């Protein structure tokens, strides 16, 4: 077995665990009984710990180092590079902290849904504070040059920094605020009036499905459900892409706009090359 085949064996195991986590998270958002949150938190913590164990194993680290010095195809080189970057971050964070974060975020999501439904911020505040404290610990473990948020930002935007974002946002604000003032000065037009009324959720769902089909979303490799807040989840491959929207009886636009937005994410996920799944 070649080193790259050994790599695929390891990374496929990681990918399988992450896919299971994705499915559990989707289930929590769409249909899990509210009383199951403690059990689900524990499951997510165990799976997250197993991912961390594989990623941080010395043998896997040595394998990635060997592969970094080998002649590989472009796709293989990128896969190894990105996996090595993820591992370099993972080895700095204790497994216990990874598991604590998984439990805290799972529990907090359920509390957030309740707090939003009851319009009661105080229900969610303690859970959010706990997550912030855990994220601070994570940032300190990973390390940073300027701001603690830099350590977390690079997980999604490699090479990006807080200071650079502040500069970009300041530039956007300088242009957008005057534009917004001009728009406000023109007065408002209620373009959404036709979308306001009393719309059955079942009717809204049918309209969203038709809309998604029109833009090319493949329902043989995806589905649409409802949740407190819209999201898109790719469960391990480009043939299992799950979208959600939130239905509001008095506002048809909320669901339609969400369907278009999430549908865009869904088209991206379904369009990813099948041969790269699991890498």
Which role fits each region the language model picked out?
Residues 7, 143, 254-278:
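Active-site recognition of the HExxH zinc-binding catalytic motif
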Residues 39, 168, 259:
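Short acidic-hydrophobic sequence patches enriched in Asp/Glu that either
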Residues 1-6, 10, 74-80, 206-213, ...:
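Short secondary-structure boundary segments
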Residues 23-29, 223-244, 265-279:
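Conserved catalytic-core motifs characterized by acidic clusters
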Residues 1-160:
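A well-structured
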Residues 18, 58, 119, 187, ...:
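Secondary-structure transition/capping residues
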Residues 104-254:
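Contiguous, non-catalytic segments that form substrate-binding/exosite surfaces or channel walls
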């Amino acid at each position: 077995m070649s080193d790259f085949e050994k790599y695929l064996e390891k990374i496929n195991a990681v990918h399988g665990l992450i896919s299971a986590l994705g499915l559990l998270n989707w289930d929590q958002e769409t249909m899990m009984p509210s009383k199951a949150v403690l059990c689900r938190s524990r499951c997510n913590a165990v799976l997250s710990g197993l991912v961390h164990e594989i990623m941080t194993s010395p043998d896997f680290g040595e394998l990635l180092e060997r592969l970094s010095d080998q002649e590989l195809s472009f796709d293989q080189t990128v896969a190894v590079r990105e996996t090595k970057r993820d591992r370099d971050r993972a080895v700095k964070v204790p497994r216990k902290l990874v598991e604590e974060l998984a439990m805290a975020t799972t529990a907090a999501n359920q509390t957030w849904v309740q707090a939003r439904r009851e319009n009661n911020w105080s229900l969610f505040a303690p859970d959010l504070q706990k997550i912030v404290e855990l994220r601070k610990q994570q940032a300190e473990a990973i390390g940073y040059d300027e701001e603690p948020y830099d350590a977390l930002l690079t997980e999604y935007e490699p090479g990006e920094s807080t200071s650079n974002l502040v500069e970009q946002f300041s530039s956007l604000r300088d242009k957008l605020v005057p534009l917004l003032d001009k728009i406000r000065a023109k007065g408002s037009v209620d373009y959404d009036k036709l979308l306001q009324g009393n719309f059955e959720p079942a009717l809204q769902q049918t309209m969203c499905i038709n809309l998604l089909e029109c833009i090319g979303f493949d329902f043989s490799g995806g589905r649409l459900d409802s949740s407190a807040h819209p999201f898109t989840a790719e469960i391990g491959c480009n043939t299992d892409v799950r979208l959600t929207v939130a239905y509001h009886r008095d506002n048809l636009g909320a669901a339609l706009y969400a369907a278009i937005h999430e549908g865009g994410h869904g088209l991206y996920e379904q369009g990813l090359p099948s041969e790269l799944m699991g890498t």
